[in-house]
């Protein structure tokens, strides 16, 4: 009994002391050059591992990459940035085996023509929607490896628009049936009709997966105005038979030739890289043999917004730019030439910076047992993907590498 009382007094004294003088983490503080060297080696191993390569490709590809391939790379990079922003806003985090390995990026441009049996002539007067068709049959053999699919369309300003904003809704077109609807609602949002051009992105993973498994279900997508068969007065009263016109214009759709709802119109430029398209992220089967699903919640940590603006001495994310040709000695990666990989550094004071009660108890335990396990260290918490462009022989590859950019840190 006396022994337990003595231990309790020791713990209480340690708690009192910690509130006045914070003990620092025992993790060794490294100089920048040593950190950069270790980080470079880690990145080298990460990239090869995520691509399932044992060594860098010998072929470096052509000296000049075609514009179409660069456009796909840029479009993918922009899409991933949007996805990371959405993930941050929803406070969600995915940490699965499928997240780890690199994804092959495939782009499918909109094609002309309407599918059979999907005449959606509910509102014959005025243009109330646009239909978008895609041929994704080349990806059917890898249908089970679809990781994500995004529908992207470029909104362009409409100077003659009568309203500054309009609500649009995205639908999957279904085969007509007396007992089911002709459309399946996917998403909706308010969009500006004027202003600078902007890309609109919609998650259509489930829809595209259905198309890949059942080709006959691929009847296209439709963007329609909300409540297309009537419009509204300023006070909210409904005006029947006064059809609201879709005033939002999209790049690649010749609106002047649209005369009826569901009329696709014609493509202004068939090869225009800004036309509506799908981006499919596919996980090659040889990179994932036994996929698992999972997820967890996360909380905000010491991120770049805070650490890059403040002279924080404790645990924080630090900027570190890696030049792939110079630091890695690689010429086979065409884009990017370099990127901010960043790293975590700084001491972890007990009781204040630790992110869990477990870390506090661990600190006290280590004080009583100095030869036991190490104290909390400054480690990455949030990481973002990196898009790369490289060649395998003469074939260009645009792929997404997960967890390559450190965005925030924590003590753990």
From Swiss-Prot:
<dbReference type="Pfam" id="PF00688">
    <property type="entry name" value="TGFb_propeptide"/>
</dbReference>
<dbReference type="GO" id="GO:0008083">
    <property type="term" value="F:growth factor activity"/>
</dbReference>
<dbReference type="InterPro" id="IPR015615">
    <property type="entry name" value="TGF-beta-rel"/>
</dbReference>
<dbReference type="GO" id="GO:0005114">
    <property type="term" value="F:type II transforming growth factor beta receptor binding"/>
</dbReference>
<comment type="similarity">
    <text>Belongs to the TGF-beta family.</text>
</comment>
<keyword id="KW-0339">Growth factor</keyword>
<feature type="glycosylation site" description="N-linked (GlcNAc...) asparagine">
    <location>
        <position position="142"/>
    </location>
</feature>
<dbReference type="GO" id="GO:0048566">
    <property type="term" value="P:embryonic digestive tract development"/>
</dbReference>
<dbReference type="GO" id="GO:0031012">
    <property type="term" value="C:extracellular matrix"/>
</dbReference>
<dbReference type="GO" id="GO:0045216">
    <property type="term" value="P:cell-cell junction organization"/>
</dbReference>
<feature type="disulfide bond">
    <location>
        <begin position="307"/>
        <end position="316"/>
    </location>
</feature>
<dbReference type="GO" id="GO:0042127">
    <property type="term" value="P:regulation of cell population proliferation"/>
</dbReference>
<dbReference type="GO" id="GO:0045893">
    <property type="term" value="P:positive regulation of DNA-templated transcription"/>
</dbReference>
<keyword id="KW-0272">Extracellular matrix</keyword>
<dbReference type="GO" id="GO:0070483">
    <property type="term" value="P:detection of hypoxia"/>
</dbReference>
<dbReference type="GO" id="GO:0051781">
    <property type="term" value="P:positive regulation of cell division"/>
</dbReference>
<comment type="function">
    <text>Transforming growth factor beta-3 proprotein: Precursor of the Latency-associated peptide (LAP) and Transforming growth factor beta-3 (TGF-beta-3) chains, which constitute the regulatory and active subunit of TGF-beta-3, respectively.</text>
</comment>
<keyword id="KW-0964">Secreted</keyword>
<feature type="signal peptide">
    <location>
        <begin position="1"/>
        <end position="23"/>
    </location>
</feature>
<dbReference type="GO" id="GO:0034713">
    <property type="term" value="F:type I transforming growth factor beta receptor binding"/>
</dbReference>
<dbReference type="GO" id="GO:0007399">
    <property type="term" value="P:nervous system development"/>
</dbReference>
<keyword id="KW-0325">Glycoprotein</keyword>
<dbReference type="GO" id="GO:0034714">
    <property type="term" value="F:type III transforming growth factor beta receptor binding"/>
</dbReference>
<dbReference type="GO" id="GO:0003198">
    <property type="term" value="P:epithelial to mesenchymal transition involved in endocardial cushion formation"/>
</dbReference>
<dbReference type="InterPro" id="IPR016319">
    <property type="entry name" value="TGF-beta"/>
</dbReference>
<keyword id="KW-0732">Signal</keyword>
<dbReference type="GO" id="GO:0060317">
    <property type="term" value="P:cardiac epithelial to mesenchymal transition"/>
</dbReference>
<dbReference type="GO" id="GO:0007179">
    <property type="term" value="P:transforming growth factor beta receptor signaling pathway"/>
</dbReference>
<keyword id="KW-0497">Mitogen</keyword>
<comment type="subunit">
    <text>Latency-associated peptide: Homodimer; disulfide-linked. Latency-associated peptide: Interacts with Transforming growth factor beta-3 (TGF-beta-3) chain; interaction is non-covalent and maintains (TGF-beta-3) in a latent state. Latency-associated peptide: Interacts (via cell attachment site) with integrins, leading to release of the active TGF-beta-3. Transforming growth factor beta-3: Homodimer; disulfide-linked. Transforming growth factor beta-3: Interacts with TGF-beta receptors (TGFBR1 and TGFBR2), leading to signal transduction.</text>
</comment>
<keyword id="KW-0165">Cleavage on pair of basic residues</keyword>
<dbReference type="InterPro" id="IPR029034">
    <property type="entry name" value="Cystine-knot_cytokine"/>
</dbReference>
<dbReference type="GO" id="GO:0042802">
    <property type="term" value="F:identical protein binding"/>
</dbReference>
<comment type="function">
    <text>Transforming growth factor beta-3: Multifunctional protein that regulates embryogenesis and cell differentiation and is required in various processes such as secondary palate development. Activation into mature form follows different steps: following cleavage of the proprotein in the Golgi apparatus, Latency-associated peptide (LAP) and Transforming growth factor beta-3 (TGF-beta-3) chains remain non-covalently linked rendering TGF-beta-3 inactive during storage in extracellular matrix.</text>
</comment>
<dbReference type="GO" id="GO:0001775">
    <property type="term" value="P:cell activation"/>
</dbReference>
<dbReference type="InterPro" id="IPR001111">
    <property type="entry name" value="TGF-b_propeptide"/>
</dbReference>
<feature type="glycosylation site" description="N-linked (GlcNAc...) asparagine">
    <location>
        <position position="74"/>
    </location>
</feature>
<protein>
    <recommendedName>
        <fullName>Transforming growth factor beta-3 proprotein</fullName>
    </recommendedName>
</protein>
<dbReference type="GO" id="GO:0010936">
    <property type="term" value="P:negative regulation of macrophage cytokine production"/>
</dbReference>
<dbReference type="GO" id="GO:0010718">
    <property type="term" value="P:positive regulation of epithelial to mesenchymal transition"/>
</dbReference>
<keyword id="KW-1015">Disulfide bond</keyword>
<dbReference type="GO" id="GO:0008284">
    <property type="term" value="P:positive regulation of cell population proliferation"/>
</dbReference>
